[in-house]
UniProtKB/Swiss-Prot annotation:
<keyword id="KW-0822">Tryptophan biosynthesis</keyword>
<dbReference type="GO" id="GO:0004640">
    <property type="term" value="F:phosphoribosylanthranilate isomerase activity"/>
</dbReference>
<keyword id="KW-0413">Isomerase</keyword>
<keyword id="KW-0028">Amino-acid biosynthesis</keyword>
<dbReference type="InterPro" id="IPR001240">
    <property type="entry name" value="PRAI_dom"/>
</dbReference>
<keyword id="KW-0057">Aromatic amino acid biosynthesis</keyword>
<dbReference type="InterPro" id="IPR011060">
    <property type="entry name" value="RibuloseP-bd_barrel"/>
</dbReference>
<dbReference type="Pfam" id="PF00697">
    <property type="entry name" value="PRAI"/>
</dbReference>
<dbReference type="InterPro" id="IPR013785">
    <property type="entry name" value="Aldolase_TIM"/>
</dbReference>
<dbReference type="InterPro" id="IPR044643">
    <property type="entry name" value="TrpF_fam"/>
</dbReference>
<comment type="similarity">
    <text>Belongs to the TrpF family.</text>
</comment>
<protein>
    <recommendedName>
        <fullName>N-(5'-phosphoribosyl)anthranilate isomerase</fullName>
        <ecNumber>5.3.1.24</ecNumber>
    </recommendedName>
</protein>
<dbReference type="GO" id="GO:0000162">
    <property type="term" value="P:L-tryptophan biosynthetic process"/>
</dbReference>
<comment type="pathway">
    <text>Amino-acid biosynthesis; L-tryptophan biosynthesis; L-tryptophan from chorismate: step 3/5.</text>
</comment>
């Protein structure tokens, strides 16, 4: 894999809760940031804090795309957030019990990212009915929609041809090997750039992004 591949790998920093980290993501060249509205998540952000980030990005050129993340939210909660905040994409979990197929297809917006949790080998056929612009292939956890800090067996996704972001247990130490091994369209990190659950570490964010770009 050549250096250009690393330079082109998309980077999503998920679970951002404060403006300073959002600024660092922009300065370092992240492609997406995730604002988490999952009720049970330590990364859940308030509408007020989310609005500060959104306003800064809208007033600043070359900002990352804004992704609003939902899991086990009611359709009413999703409506409230998406109607209140400017955003580029909505992220949802494929087996979210609170969303019907109609919700997923017609309600969530024009641009979507679907998170598919992997605990066994999957094939292109398994993903054909997912109506989203992008996929995130993430570790499976019974009670969490993501952000577990656990990797999964990358051989389980070795035959997937569709464009996807790799998630699950990534950090600055293993992300370059993950890119070389899996060759994803992009990478997605949450807990791997934190000092404690829900608290992003600025240096870890910077190191993660730079390691992706430099292939370190």
């Amino acid at each position: 894999m050549n250096e250009n591949t690393f330079e082109k790998t998309k980077i999503k920093i998920c679970g951002i809760r404060d403006l300073e980290i959002a600024k660092i993501c922009r300065e370092e060249g992240a492609d997406y940031i995730g604002l988490n509205f999952v009720p049970s998540s330590p990364r859940k952000i308030s509408l007020k804090d989310a609005q500060k980030i959104v306003e800064f990005y809208r007033d600043t050129k070359n900002s990352p795309e804004i992704v609003l993340l939902f899991y086990q939210n009611s359709p009413e909660e999703i409506r409230t957030v998406t109607s209140s905040l400017y955003h580029d994409l909505i992220q949802w979990v494929w087996d979210d019990p609170k969303l019907t197929f109609v919700d997923r297809k017609n309600f969530l917006g024009k641009r979507q990212i679907c998170s598919y949790r992997v605990n066994s080998p999957i094939y292109n056929e398994d993903l054909k009915n997912i109506p989203s612009e992008l996929l995130i292939l993430d570790s499976y956890s019974k009670d969490a929609g993501g952000g577990t800090g656990e990797t999964f067996n990358w051989n389980f996704i070795s035959r997937i041809e569709r464009k996807f972001l790799l998630a699950g247990g990534l950090n600055s130490s293993n992300v370059s090997n993950a890119i070389r091994t899996v060759k994803p369209y992009g990478v997605d990190v949450a807990s791997g750039v934190e000092s404690s659950p829900g608290i992003k570490d600025s240096q870890k964010v910077i190191q993660f992004i730079r390691n992706v770009r430099l292939g370190l």
